[in-house]
Curated annotation (Swiss-Prot):
Ranges for region Disordered: 447-475, 574-608, 738-821, 846-867, 888-1022, 1039-1072
Protein name, per record: GTPase-activating protein and VPS9 domain-containing protein 1
Topological type in the membrane: Peripheral membrane protein
Pfam families listed in its UniProt record: DUF5601, RasGAP, VPS9
Source organism (scientific name): Mus musculus
Gene from which the chain derives: Gapvd1
Keywords, in A-Z order: Endocytosis, Endosome, GTPase activation, Guanine-nucleotide releasing factor, Membrane, Phosphoprotein
Compositionally biased residues, Basic and acidic residues: 778-789, 888-902, 952-973, 995-1006, 1061-1071
Residues with PTM Phosphotyrosine: Y460
Cellular component, GO, one term: cytosol
A single MF term (Gene Ontology): GTPase activating protein binding
Length: 1458
C-alpha cells in the first residue's frame, strides 16, 4: 500500500466536507423551491379550471347564471383563498379525507354512482361530475390521477353507453356523465392541446387570410345573403337563366375553395396523427371494443359513435372556436371566418361517416370531390389501437416519485358530494358496488360539520401556515409528497393520492374559500436528506448481497428516483414542531431519518411488498374502527390528535395499544402470525443475519418494512387486566399477544426501527410497535431526517437511549416463558432466524436473570478470514454449553474477541431512542464489546431507574449496583407501575455499558456461557418474570436494529483487534466516519474504559476525521515525511506524524482563540497518543479507505440535486402551461362579454357604419372611429357586467371592442377608393411575383452580406408576414410586421455571433423576405396603418415600421427585366 500523506488526506477530507455541506444546502433550497412551485401550480390549476367552467356557463348563458353573475364569479375566483380543512371540519377532517381518498381510488364506484345519480334524476349530478374531475382527480395534473380518470371513463362506457337503448343519441346530446367528463378531460389534457395546435393552427390561419366571402354551397341560402340590389348587380335579373347560371358558378367556386380548405385540414390531420394523445386513443379503442360486444349495435353504428367522440366532441369544437383552445391567440375571427370554419367542421364529420350511413343527398355532390377514405384512414389509426386493460402511462414521467397529498374542494362541493352519494345509496340503483359505497359512507360523521368562515385549503403550502397543534396535518397539507421506488407499493399509492386533487367545482356562486383536505399520507423521505450511513449501507446491501436479489433501483440505479421527490417540506417545520410533539425525542430527527430511509434499503424489498399487499385489504378497516372508537369520546379532539393521531398520547395507564390483537380475541394473533409466515416464507432466509464474508447485510430491512406498514393500521385499544385478575392466564395471553405483534419476525424489523421515532413523550408509557408505523408519525420523521443531515457528514450510527439497557435486555426474554406459540414464533425470533449465525439457547424453564446477558457466538470469520462461519442449524436448535464452547474453539477466537464481536453486532442492531441530553450520539460506536445486547434468549431484568439522563455519568455506576435491589422492590408493585419506572431514562448508556463490561469480566470470566446457561435463579417467580417479560418486550420493540447500524458494527469491531491487523475490507465501516462536532462523546466516556481497543480505535478514527477535515493546509508542517520515515517502530507516540500534525492545529486554534476547536483537537491528540506508530498508520489508511468508499454518497447527493432541478424545471413548465390556459380562458371570457355588450348596441353600430361610409377624407374617418370607440368604452364602464372587472380585463375588453368594430368597417377603411385600391395592389402583387422568380438571396440588387446567406430564405419570417391579412386592426397588423422583423434579427444574430446586425444588414434581408412571401395588398396595408395608427406609433414600433415602408418602396423600384 502506498504510504499515506496526512496533509493530502486532510486536504481531501476538507474538500469533501465543504462540498457535501454546500450540496446539502443547495438540495434543501431546491426542496423548498419545488414545494413552493408545486403549491403554486395546484392553486393556479384549481382557479384556472374554475374559470374555464365559468366560461362555459357564460357561453351557454343558461337561466341559472346571468352574464353579470358569471363576471362576478370570475372576480371572486381570482381571489380564492385556500384554507386548511381542519379549520372548517375540525377532527372530522380525517374522516372526510379518508372518504375522499378511498373514493378516489375506486373508479368503478365513482362511475356506477354517477350513472345511478342520472337514473335517479339527481339535479346536482353535473356539479358532482365537475367535483370528481377538479377535486378528486385534481385536473389530472399528476399521471396517476389521469390513470384513475381514464378508468372512470371506461366504466362509464360500460355502465352508461353499453346499457343505453340508443347510445349514439345519448352521446350526441352531450349531457350524459361520460360526455361531460370526456369534455373536461380532453380540454385539460396538455397532449390534446399540442395535437390540436399542431393540426389546426396552419390551416385556420390560412382560412383567416382568405376570409373575404362566405363559402356557402346551398344556392338558396347563398341568394339570401345579398340584398335585392346586390343580387341584381351580381347575378342579373332574378329568375332568368343567366341568374341561375351565375348563382351556380358562385356555388361551384365556393365548393372548390371549400374542398381545397378541407383537404388542407385533412392533410394536417394525417401528418400529425403521430402526436395524437395516447390517453384519448385508449378511450376510443375501449369504446369500440366494449360496444362492439353489444348484439343490438351494428359495427357501423359503433364506428359512428367513435367518430362522434373524436370529431364532434374533440376536433370540431376546436375547429369552430380555435381561440377558446389557444390555437389562435391574437387573430380575431369575424362572422365570415366563423361561418367558413363551421362549414369545414361539418364536412369533416360527413367525410368521416362516409359509407356508414346515408348522407344528405345535397351534400353527396360536394363529398364526391374528396377522396372517400381520407378521414376514415385517420379514424382507423386511432380506433385501431390495441384495447389494453390498463390506461397508458407516459414512458418518461418527469414527476415520477411526486404524489398528491391533498384534495381541494369547497365546503359546498364536499357536502353536495356526500349527499349525492347518500342519495345514490338510498336510491337502490347500485348493484355490486353497493357494499363498497356503504363501507365508505359508514365512516363519515352523521352530522354535517359546521361551516366556519373559511372554506379553502392549501395543499402544499401549509406547512408554514399550520399551527403547531396539528403536526400531522401539516405534513399532509403538502400537496406533493414523494414516492420512493424502493419503498413499499402501498406507500407509493398513498402518497400519490394527495397531490392531485386541487380543484373545486363551481356549483356555488361565491366559492372564494377552498378547503385543503389531507388524504393522509404515509412516511416520506426528502430527496438528498439521507445520511451518509444510510446511503453507504444501501450501496453495500445492493452490491454484496448473495442470498437476496438486488434491486438495482435502490442506489446503483437511481437513488435520485428512489428518494427523489419526497418533498415533504415539513422537514423544516418539523424541527420547530418536534419538541412540542414528543418531548423525549430531541434527536428523533436522526432516528426517523434513518428509519425512514432504511425502509427500502434492503434488497429483498419486493418480496416484502408482496407480503404487505396480502395483508393490506384485510387490515384496511381496523384504523377506521379505532377512529370510530376514539370519536365516540371525542378523544382525538381533546388530545389534540385531530391531526397527529399519536395514540400514545391517549393511552391510559391500563390501556393496551397492542397491534392487531386484544384480550377478547386471543386467536387473532396466531392467525396473523400464520399469515405473515405464509406471505413472507421466502423472505425468512433472505433476512438472516449473514456473515460479513458472504457480503450479506446483517438485517434485511425491507422484509420488515412491509409488515410494519400493515400492522401499523390495526390497533386494539382494550383495557388491560388489572392486578386482581387471574394472572397466569391473562399474562400468558398477553405475552403471546406481545410476541406476535411487536415485530418479532424476520419481516418485522422495520416496525421496530420505526418505533424508535414514535416513542411517546411520556417516558413511562411504553407503547407497542404499532404506533410508530402509523402514517401520522411522519412529521417527526422528516424533521428528524433534516437534523440528522445537517451535521457535517450526516451519518451517525444510532442515537443512545436512556432505555438502552432495558431495551437490550428485552431482546433476551422474547421467548423465555413457555407458551403454546413458542414454536410458531421460532421462525420470527430475531435471535434464531434473523441473526442466522447463532443458534439460540432456548430454555424451557424460567432461568435466573443474570446481571448481563451473554454474547452471541463468534461472527468474525467472515470479516477476517473471508469464509462464512455459520452455526450448524438455524431456527430453534438448542445449543448446550459444550456445543457452544466447541463452536468457539473451532473458530478459534480469543474469548474477548468473541464477546466484543457479538456485543457490537447486537448493540448496533438495536436502535435506541434519543434522549434530549444525549442528542446524536452514535450508540453503537460507544458500546463496549462485552456488553452483549441480544444474543440469547435468556431473560433479562429491566433496571428500574431513579436518575434522569442528564445526571452525571458517575451516577451510572451506583445505578448499576442498585439494580438487583431495585428489581426486588419493583416486584412488589403492580406490573404496570413497574413498567413506568423501568421505562424511565437512566444514566447515559456509554457509562453504564462500561460498568457492565467490567462486571462481566469480574463476575463471569471466560466461562460466561456455561455460567449463564446452566444456573437457574430463583429470584423471580414465574408470574413476575412474565410481567417483566412484557415490560422488556415493550422496550425491546424500540431497540430493534436498523440495517445500517448492524452492518456497521459488523465490520468495525473486526477492524481493530489487539494487534490491529484486520483488513479494511468492507464499506460498512464507512458509516462510522459520518460524525460531526455534535457526535463527539465526552472524554469521561473515553476514560471509562481505555483498554477497550476496538471501541477506542473507532472513537479515535471518528475524532481524527473531524480534526483532519477542519484543518487548514497553511498550517501544515514542512518536514513531516522525514520525521515519519525516520521513526523506529517503538518511538514514543508523541513523535508520530499525526501528533505532530495535531500539535500544529492546536497551536493555530490557540492563536485564533477557537475554544471549541482547541477542546476537540486536544481530545483527539490524547486519544491518538495511546496508539503505537503502526496502529496510527493503520488509522490513516483506514480513514483514507473510508474516504474512497464514500464516493457513492457524493454521487447520491449529485443525483438528488439533478433530480430536484429536473423536477423544478418541469413543474415550472407545467405552471407556464396552466397560466397560459388561464390567460386564454380569461381572454375568451372577455371576448364573449364584449360580444354580449355589442349585441345590445347593434343599432348604434349600424348608424356608425352608415356615417363612416359618407366620409371621404382620411382624417375625418380616423376621428370618427376614435370617437365611436371612446363612446363604446364609456358604455362598457357603466355596464353592470363590467363592474367587477380588473384593469387588465378592461384593457382586453377595449382591444376586443376595437377589433370587433374595425372588423365591421374593414373593407370600407382598408379600400377607401374601393376598386382603384384593389387594382393598384394587384399590380404590385404581380410585379413582386415576377421578381420572386429571378431574385435570389445573393442578387446584386440586394447586396446581402455573405455571412448571413446560410439562413436564407428565412422561411419563418416569410410565414409571419404571410398572415398579415388575417389581422384586421391597424394595431394587429403593425404587431405582425414587428414579429417578422424580430424573427429576421434573431436569425441574423444566429448567423454571425461576433457582431450585432445593423440596418444595412437587415433591410436587404427584409426586402428579400417580402419578395419571396409576397403578402397580398401591400400598398393598401401601408395606407391603412398610416391613416388609422400613425399617431400611435412610437419607439420600437415606429423604427420597424419605417424600415418596412422603406423596403416596400425599394421593391417598387427593382426592375425584374434586368
Amino acid at each position: 500500500m502506498v504510504k499515506l500523506d496526512i496533509h493530502t488526506l486532510a486536504h481531501h477530507l476538507k474538500q469533501e466536507r465543504l462540498y457535501v455541506s454546500s450540496e446539502k444546502q443547495l438540495i434543501q433550497r431546491l426542496n423548498a423551491d419545488v414545494l413552493k412551485t408545486a403549491e403554486k401550480l395546484y392553486r393556479t390549476a384549481w382557479i384556472a379550471k374554475q374559470q374555464r367552467i365559468n366560461l362555459d356557463r357564460l357561453i351557454i348563458t343558461s337561466a341559472e347564471a346571468s352574464p353579470a353573475e358569471c363576471c362576478q364569479h370570475a372576480k371572486i375566483l381570482e381571489d380564492t383563498q385556500f384554507v386548511d380543512g381542519y379549520k372548517q371540519l375540525g377532527f372530522q377532517e380525517t374522516a372526510y379525507g379518508e372518504f375522499l381518498s378511498r373514493l378516489r381510488e375506486n373508479p368503478r364506484l365513482i362511475a356506477s354512482s354517477l350513472v345511478a345519480g342520472e337514473k335517479l334524476n339527481q339535479e346536482n349530478t353535473q356539479s358532482v361530475i365537475y367535483t370528481v374531475f377538479t377535486s378528486l382527480y385534481g385536473n389530472c395534473i399528476m399521471q396517476e390521477d389521469e390513470s384513475y380518470l381514464l378508468q372512470v371513463l371506461r366504466y362509464l362506457i360500460e355502465f352508461e353507453l353499453k346499457e343505453s337503448d340508443n347510445p349514439r343519441r345519448l352521446l350526441r346530446r352531450g349531457t350524459c356523465a361520460f360526455s361531460i367528463l370526456f369534455k373536461l378531460f380532453s380540454e385539460g389534457l396538455f397532449s390534446a392541446k399540442l395535437f390540436l395546435t399542431a393540426t389546426l393552427h396552419e390551416p385556420i390561419m390560412q382560412l383567416l387570410v382568405e376570409d373575404e366571402d362566405h363559402l356557402e354551397t346551398d344556392p338558396n341560402k347563398l341568394i339570401e345573403r345579398f340584398s335585392p340590389a346586390q343580387q341584381e348587380k351580381l347575378f342579373g335579373e332574378k329568375g332568368s337563366d343567366r341568374f341561375r347560371q351565375k348563382v351556380q358558378e358562385m356555388v361551384d367556386s365556393n365548393e372548390a375553395k371549400l374542398v381545397a380548405l378541407v383537404n388542407k385540414f385533412i392533410g394536417y390531420l394525417k401528418q400529425n396523427t403521430y402526436c395524437f394523445p395516447h390517453s384519448l386513443r385508449w378511450i376510443v379503442s375501449q369504446m369500440y371494443k366494449t360496444l362492439s360486444c353489444v348484439d343490438r349495435l351494428e359495427v357501423g353504428e359503433v364506428r359512428a359513435m367513435c367518430t362522434d367522440l373524436l370529431l364532434a366532441c374533440f376536433i370540431c369544437p376546436a375547429v369552430v372556436n380555435p381561440e377558446q383552445y389557444g390555437i389562435i391567440s391574437d387573430a380575431p375571427i369575424n362572422e365570415v371566418a366563423r361561418f367558413n370554419l363551421m362549414q369545414v367542421g361539418r364536412l369533416l364529420q360527413q367525410l368521416a361517416m362516409t359509407g356508414t350511413e346515408e348522407g344528405d343527398p345535397r351534400t353527396k355532390n360536394s363529398l364526391g370531390k374528396f377522396d372517400k377514405g381520407c378521414v376514415a384512414a385517420f379514424l382507423d389509426v386511432v380506433i385501431g389501437g390495441r384495447a389494453v386493460e390498463t390506461p397508458p402511462m407516459s414512458s418518461v414521467n418527469l414527476l415520477e416519485g411526486l404524489s398528491r397529498t391533498v384534495v381541494y374542494i369547497s365546503y359546498s362541493q364536499l357536502i353536495t358530494l356526500v349527499n349525492f352519494m347518500k342519495s345514490v345509496m338510498s336510491g337502490d340503483q347500485l348493484k355490486e358496488d353497493r357494499m363498497a359505497l356503504d363501507n365508505l359512507l359508514a365512516n363519515l360523521p352523521q352530522a354535517k360539520p359546521g361551516k366556519s368562515s373559511s372554506l379553502d385549503m392549501t395543499p402544499y403550502s401549509t406547512p408554514q401556515m399550520s399551527p403547531a397543534t396539528t403536526p400531522a396535518n401539516k405534513k399532509n397539507r403538502l400537496p406533493i409528497a414523494t414516492r420512493s421506488r424502493s419503498r413499499s407499493n402501498m406507500l407509493m399509492d398513498l402518497h400519490m393520492d394527495h397531490e392531485g386533487s386541487s380543484q373545486e367545482t363551481i356549483q356555488e356562486v361565491q366559492p372564494e374559500e377552498v378547503l385543503v383536505i389531507s388524504l393522509g399520507t404515509g412516511p416520506q423521505l426528502t430527496p438528498g436528506m439521507m445520511s451518509e450511513n444510510e446511503v453507504l449501507n444501501m450501496q453495500l446491501s445492493d452490491g454484496g448481497q448473495g442470498d437476496v436479489p438486488v434491486d438495482e433501483n435502490k442506489l446503483h440505479g437511481k437513488p435520485d428516483k428512489t428518494l427523489r421527490f419526497s418533498l415533504c417540506s415539513d422537514n423544516l417545520e418539523g424541527i420547530s414542531e418536534g419538541p412540542s410533539n414528543r418531548s423525549n425525542s430531541v434527536s428523533s430527527l436522526d432516528l426517523e431519518g434513518e428509519s425512514v430511509s432504511e425502509l427500502g434499503a434492503g434488497p429483498s424489498g419486493s418480496n416484502g411488498v408482496e407480503a404487505l399487499q396480502l395483508l393490506e385489504h384485510e387490515q384496511a378497516t381496523t384504523q377506521d374502527n379505532l377512529d370510530d372508537k376514539l370519536r365516540k369520546f371525542e378523544i382525538r379532539d381533546m388530545m389534540g390528535l385531530t391531526d397527529d393521531r399519536d395514540i400514545s398520547e391517549t393511552v391510559s395507564e391500563t390501556w393496551s395499544t397492542d397491534v392487531l390483537g386484544s384480550d377478547f380475541d386471543p386467536n387473532v394473533d396466531e392467525d396473523r402470525l400464520q399469515e405473515i409466515a405464509g406471505a413472507a416464507a421466502e423472505n425468512v432466509l433472505g433476512s438472516l443475519l449473514c456473515l460479513p464474508g458472504s457480503g450479506s447485510v446483517l438485517l434485511d430491512p425491507c422484509t420488515g418494512s412491509t409488515i410494519s406498514e400493515t400492522t401499523s393500521e390495526a390497533w386494539s385499544v382494550e383495557v388491560l387486566p388489572s392486578d386482581s385478575e387471574a394472572p397466569d392466564l391473562k399474562q400468558e395471553e398477553r405475552l403471546q399477544e406481545l410476541e406476535s405483534c411487536s415485530g418479532l419476525g424476520s419481516t418485522s424489523d422495520d416496525t421496530d426501527v420505526r418505533e424508535v421515532s414514535s416513542r411517546p413523550s411520556t417516558p413511562g408509557l411504553s407503547v407497542v410497535s404499532g404506533i410508530s408505523a402509523t402514517s401520522e408519525d411522519i412529521p417527526n420523521k422528516i424533521e428528524d431526517l433534516r437534523s440528522e443531515c445537517s451535521s457535517d457528514f450526516g451519518g451517525k450510527d444510532s442515537v443512545t437511549s436512556p432505555d438502552m439497557d432495558d431495551i437490550a435486555h428485552g431482546a433476551h426474554q422474547l421467548t423465555s416463558p413457555p407458551s403454546q406459540s413458542e414454536s410458531l414464533l421460532a421462525m420470527f425470533d430475531p435471535l434464531s432466524s434473523h441473526e442466522g449465525a447463532s443458534a439460540v439457547v432456548r430454555p424451557k424453564v424460567h432461568y435466573a436473570r443474570p446481571s448481563h446477558p451473554p454474547p452471541d457466538p463468534p461472527i468474525l470469520e467472515g470479516a477476517v478470514g473471508g469464509n462464512e462461519a455459520r452455526l450448524p442449524n438455524f431456527g430453534s436448535h438448542v445449543l448446550t454449553a459444550a456445543e457452544m464452547e466447541a463452536f468457539k474453539q473451532r473458530h478459534s477466537y480469543p474469548e474477548r474477541l468473541v464477546r466484543s464481536r457479538s456485543s457490537d453486532i447486537v448493540s448496533s442492531v438495536r436502535r435506541p431512542m434519543s434522549d434530549p441530553s444525549w442528542n446524536r450520539r452514535p450508540g453503537n460506536e460507544e458500546l463496549p464489546p462485552a456488553a452483549a445486547t441480544g444474543a440469547t434468549s435468556l431473560v433479562a431484568a429491566p433496571h428500574s431507574s431513579s436518575s434522569s439522563p442528564s445526571k452525571d455519568s458517575s451516577r451510572g455506576e451506583t445505578e448499576e449496583r442498585k439494580d438487583s435491589d431495585d428489581e426486588r422492590s419493583d416486584r412488589s408493585r403492580p406490573w404496570w407501575r413497574k413498567r413506568f419506572v423501568s421505562a424511565m431514562p437512566k444514566a447515559p448508556i456509554p457509562f453504564r455499558k462500561k460498568e457492565k463490561q467490567e462486571k462481566d469480566k469480574d463476575d463471569l470470566g471466560p466461562d460466561r456461557f456455561s455460567t449463564l446457561t446452566d444456573e437457574p435463579s430463583p429470584r423471580l417467580s414465574a408470574q413476575a418474570q412474565v410481567a417483566e417479560d412484557i415490560l422488556d418486550k415493550y422496550r425491546n420493540a424500540i431497540k430493534r436494529t436498523s440495517p445500517s447500524e448492524g452492518a456497521m458494527a459488523n465490520d468495525e469491531s473486526a477492524e481493530v483487534m489487539g494487534d490491529g491487523e484486520s483488513a479494511h475490507d468492507s464499506p460498512r465501516e464507512e458509516a462510522l466516519q459520518n460524525i460531526s462536532a455534535d457526535d463527539l462523546p465526552d472524554s469521561a466516556s473515553q476514560a471509562a474504559h481505555p483498554q477497550d481497543s476496538a471501541f477506542s480505535y473507532r472513537d479515535v478514527k471518528k475524532k481524527l476525521r473531524l480534526a483532519l477535515c477542519s484543518a487548514d493546509s497553511v498550517a501544515f508542517p514542512v518536514l513531516t515525511h522525514s520525521t515519519r520515515n525516520g521513526l523506529p517502530d517503538h518511538t514514543d507516540p508523541e513523535d508520530n506524524e499525526i501528533v505532530c500534525f495535531l500539535k500544529v492545529q492546536i497551536a493555530e486554534a490557540i492563536n485564533l482563540q477557537d475554544k471549541s476547536l482547541m477542546a476537540q483537537l486536544q481530545e483527539t491528540m490524547r486519544c491518538v497518543c495511546r496508539f503505537d506508530n503502526r496502529t496510527c498508520r493503520k488509522l490513516l489508511a483506514s480513514i483514507a479507505e473510508d474516504y474512497r468508499k464514500r464516493a457513492p454518497y457524493i454521487a447520491y447527493l449529485t443525483r438528488c440535486r439533478q433530480g430536484l432541478q429536473t423536477t423544478q424545471a418541469h413543474l415550472e413548465r407545467l405552471l407556464q402551461r396552466v397560466l397560459r390556459d388561464k390567460e386564454v380562458a380569461n381572454r375568451y371570457f372577455t371576448t364573449v362579454c364584449v360580444r354580449l355588450l355589442l349585441e345590445s348596441k347593434e343599432k348604434k353600430i349600424r348608424e356608425f357604419i352608415q356615417d363612416f361610409q359618407k366620409l371621404t377624407a382620411a382624417d375625418d374617418k380616423t376621428a370618427q372611429v376614435e370617437d365611436f370607440l371612446q363612446f363604446l368604452y364609456g358604455v362598457m364602464a357603466q355596464d353592470v357586467i363590467w363592474q367587477n372587472a380588473s384593469e387588465e380585463q378592461l384593457q382586453d375588453a377595449q382591444l376586443a371592442i376595437e377589433r370587433s368594430v374595425m372588423n365591421r368597417i374593414f373593407k370600407l377603411a382598408f379600400y377607401p377608393n374601393q376598386d382603384g385600391d384593389i387594382l393598384r395592389d394587384q399590380v404590385l402583387h404581380e410585379h413582386i411575383q415576377r421578381l420572386s422568380k429571378v431574385v435570389t438571396a445573393n442578387h446584386r440588387a440586394l447586396q446581402i452580406p455573405e455571412v448571413y446567406l446560410r439562413e436564407a430564405p428565412w422561411p419563418s419570417a416569410q410565414s409571419e408576414i404571410r398572415t398579415i391579412s388575417a389581422y384586421k386592426t391597424p394595431r394587429d397588423k403593425v404587431q405582425c410586421i414587428l414579429r417578422m422583423c424580430s424573427t429576421i434579427m434573431n436569425l441574423l444574430s444566429l448567423a454571425n455571433e461576433d457582431s450585432v446586425p445593423g440596418a444595412d444588414d437587415f433591410v436587404p434581408v427584409l426586402v428579400f423576405v417580402l419578395i419571396k412571401a409576397n403578402p397580398p395588398c401591400l400598398l393598401s396595408t401601408v395606407q391603412y396603418i398610416s391613416s388609422f395608427y400613425a399617431s400611435c406609433l412610437s419607439g420600437e414600433e415606429s423604427y420597424w415600421w419605417m424600415q418596412f415602408t422603406a423596403a416596400v418602396e425599394f421593391i417598387k423600384t427593382i426592375d425584374d427585366r434586368k
